[in-house]
C-alpha cells in the first residue's frame, strides 16, 4: 500500500518502538472498525510484523459493535492485506456485561461495564484465541495507554497514555500481569490528532470516521435510558432528603447515580445532589452540596498492577470516575472478607481523601496512581464501614 509523505514525530517514534520490540513480531490486532484500531494494525504492518485482524462480534444489529464495525474492520484488513477473523462473543457479552449491568443498576450501584468488558470479554478471550487458534503470542489494540516491562519491581507496569484527553488506563486497571506481558499498545504515545494524521498518511478508510461518544450499549440503543428501559420496567418511587422529607418522584433508581445534580426533576431552594440509592425502599436520597461530600471510602476486589500489595498505609492519587481529575488520599490496607477470598481478590483498602468527594458511586472504580503509573485499582463499595464490606 502506497503511503503519503507526511509523518508525525510521534508516529515515527511509535514505528521505531515496534521495529525494536523484543521477542516475536507476530500479533493479532483487535479491530473494532474505528480509526484507533485501524491505525494500530497499519503501524504494525508498516513495522514488518506478521499481523492478523480479529473482531469480536458483541451485539446483533447496527452500530460500531455490530454489523457496521464488522464491515469496516473487514475493509481495513482487505486494505492492509492481512487476514480477518470474527469471533462470536454475543452470548458472553450478554451474560457478563449486559445482564450484570442491568442487575447492578437495579441493585442501586453504578457499574463500570468497560472495565469488566476489557477483562472478561475482550482481552482474555482475544489472548486465548490468538494463542490457541492462530499460535500468535501477542495481541494489540488501539487503547491510549502504555505498558512498561521489566522494571525494578519485576512487574509489567501500566501507565497513562500521553494524551491526557484520551487516556484509557482507568478502564484497564483490572488486567492481570499475564495479560499485560502479551499486550501491545502502539498508540500509547500518540495524541488523537497524531492518530488522525497517521491514518490519513496510510489512506485508511476510517481516518475521518467519527468517534463513539458514549458507552457502546447507549450508542446501540440511542441512550442509556433507552437501554435500561429495554430491560427494566418503570418503578415509581420517592426522592427524599436525608431526613425523609419527600421532595419529588422518580420512575426508577437505575436512572440516577451518586453525585448527580442535573435532571433530578426536583424544584428546591438550592441545588440538590444524589447521595444514596436505596433499592430496598426504591428511594433516591438527595442533599444540598454542603451535606453531599464524602471524605472516605472502602475499595474492594483490588487488582494491584504495578506494585506488590502494600502492607502499610501509603499516600497516592486516586481517580474515582473516568472523566474526573485524580485526587490525593491516604490508603490503608484492610483485612479481606470471605467474599473477597471466594472471588480470589483478597485485597481491600480504606481511603481517606484530602478533600471531600461528591461522586463516590458504588460499582465505579477507584484507580490508584503515582504520577502516570497505575498502581492498582478496585471497586468502590456500597458502604464505608472499614470492618465489613
Swiss-Prot record:
Query: Recorded E.C. number(s)?
Result: 2.8.1.13
Pfam families with a match to the protein in the record: tRNA_Me_trans, tRNA_Me_trans_C, tRNA_Me_trans_M
Q: Where is this region: Interaction with tRNA?
A: 166-168, 321-322
Class of enzymatic activity (EC top level): transferase
Name the Gene Ontology molecular function terms of this record.
Answer: ATP binding; tRNA binding; tRNA-uridine 2-sulfurtransferase activity
Q: Which GO terms describe its biological process?
A: tRNA wobble position uridine thiolation
Instruction: List the CDD domains hit by this protein, alphabetically.
Output: MnmA_TRMU-like
Which residues are the signal sequence here? none
* Cysteines paired by S-S bonds: 117-216
Active site: which residues? 117, 216
* Cell compartment(s), UniProt: Cytoplasm
Primary residence:
cytoplasm
> Site annotated as Interaction with tRNA: where?
143, 364
* SUPFAM superfamilies for this protein: Adenine nucleotide alpha hydrolases-like
Any one cellular component term from GO for this entry? cytoplasm
User: What family is this?
Assistant: Belongs to the MnmA/TRMU family.
Q: Which NCBIfam families match?
A: PRK00143.1 (NF001138), trmU (TIGR00420)
- From the Swiss-Prot or TrEMBL record, give the protein name: tRNA-specific 2-thiouridylase MnmA
Amino acid at each position: 500500500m502506497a503511503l503519503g509523505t507526511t509523518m508525525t514525530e510521534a508516529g515515527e517514534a511509535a514505528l521505531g518502538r515496534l521495529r525494536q520490540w523484543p521477542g516475536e513480531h507476530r500479533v493479532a490486532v483487535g479491530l473494532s472498525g474505528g480509526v484507533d484500531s485501524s491505525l494500530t494494525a497499519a503501524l504494525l504492518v508498516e513495522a514488518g510484523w506478521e499481523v492478523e485482524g480479529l473482531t469480536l462480534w458483541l451485539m446483533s444489529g447496527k452500530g460500531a459493535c455490530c454489523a457496521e464495525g464488522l464491515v469496516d474492520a473487514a475493509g481495513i484488513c482487505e486494505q492492509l492485506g492481512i487476514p480477518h477473523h470474527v469471533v462470536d462473543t454475543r452470548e458472553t457479552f450478554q451474560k457478563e456485561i449486559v445482564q450484570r449491568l442491568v442487575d447492578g443498576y437495579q441493585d442501586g450501584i453504578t457499574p463500570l461495564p468497560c472495565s469488566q468488558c476489557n477483562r472478561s470479554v475482550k482481552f482474555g478471550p482475544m489472548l486465548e484465541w490468538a494463542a490457541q487458534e492462530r499460535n500468535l503470542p501477542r495481541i494489540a489494540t488501539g487503547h491510549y495507554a502504555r505498558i512498561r516491562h521489566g522494571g525494578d519491581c519485576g512487574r509489567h507496569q501500566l501507565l497513562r497514555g500521553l494524551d491526557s484527553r484520551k487516556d484509557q488506563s482507568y478502564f484497564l486497571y483490572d488486567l492481570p500481569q499475564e495479560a499485560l506481558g502479551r499486550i501491545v499498545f502502539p498508540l500509547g504515545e500518540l495524541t488523537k490528532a497524531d492518530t488522525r494524521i497517521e491514518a490519513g498518511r496510510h489512506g485508511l478508510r476510517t481516518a475521518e470516521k467519527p468517534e463513539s461518544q458514549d458507552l457502546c450499549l447507549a450508542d446501540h440503543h440511542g441512550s442509556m435510558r433507552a437501554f435500561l428501559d429495554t430491560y427494566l420496567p418503570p418503578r415509581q418511587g420517592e426522592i427524599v432528603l436525608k431526613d425523609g422529607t419527600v421532595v419529588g418522584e422518580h420512575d426508577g433508581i437505575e436512572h440516577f447515580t451518586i453525585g448527580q445534580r442535573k435532571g433530578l426533576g426536583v424544584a428546591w431552594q438550592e441545588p440538590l445532589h444524589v447521595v444514596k440509592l436505596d433499592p430496598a425502599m426504591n428511594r433516591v436520597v438527595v442533599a444540598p452540596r454542603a451535606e453531599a461530600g464524602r471524605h472516605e471510602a472502602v475499595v474492594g476486589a483490588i487488582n494491584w498492577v504495578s506494585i506488590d500489595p502494600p502492607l502499610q498505609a501509603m499516600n497516592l492519587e486516586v481517580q474515582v470516575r473516568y472523566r474526573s481529575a485524580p485526587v490525593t488520599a491516604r490508603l490503608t490496607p484492610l483485612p479481606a472478607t470471605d467474599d473477597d477470598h471466594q472471588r480470589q481478590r483478597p485485597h481491600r483498602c480504606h481511603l481517606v481523601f484530602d478533600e471531600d468527594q461528591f461522586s463516590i458511586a458504588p460499582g465505579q472504580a477507584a484507580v490508584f496512581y503515582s504520577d502516570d503509573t497505575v498502581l492498582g485499582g478496585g471497586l468502590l463499595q456500597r458502604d464505608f464501614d472499614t470492618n465489613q464490606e
